Structure formats: structure tokens, C-alpha cells
Amino acid sequence: MRATLFDLERTIRQRRQADPSQSYVAKLTAKGRGKIAQKVGEEAVETVIAAMASDRDGAIGESANLLFHLMVLLADLDIALDEVLDELDRR
């Protein structure tokens, strides 16, 4: 799983500099941190709604969306995935 997340992190960091008309990450980044944070919030709510509805497939899909958008936000904050994982290890 870590390899998948590290690959995603690398892709997100590369695409932040891409043409916004060609990359969702670049388009979202161009809209600013507030919009990225809003997307994280939306995906979190959608994940909770799916969970409360006992919608397993929905919860999986929304969790993937949540992780993706959280990683876009972390990249915008210049926080490496390793830093978050290290914090989890400390806990």
C-alpha cells in the first residue's frame, strides 16, 4: 500500500505544475488551497454518508477520493507523505 501512496504522491507533485486544461490536479491547485480544502471536506462528508448508509462500495470509492484529495492538500502544504506516516508511527 505504501508504494501505491508514494507513487500517487509523486504523480500529484508532478501534475501540480502541468497545464490546468490537461490535469485535474493542476486545475484544482490553480484554484487555491481553499478549494482543495473544500474538496477534502466534501469527500470526507461523502465518505461518512456512505458509511452511515452501510454502502460498502460507496465507502470504498469515497475513501479513495478522500485520500486523493488529502494528498493534493498535503502537496499544496509541502508536507511529504513520509512526515504523516512518521507521525502515525510515533503514535
Regions found by a protein language model. Give the residues of each.
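Flexible "arm" and connector segments at domain edges
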Residues: M1-S63, L67-R91
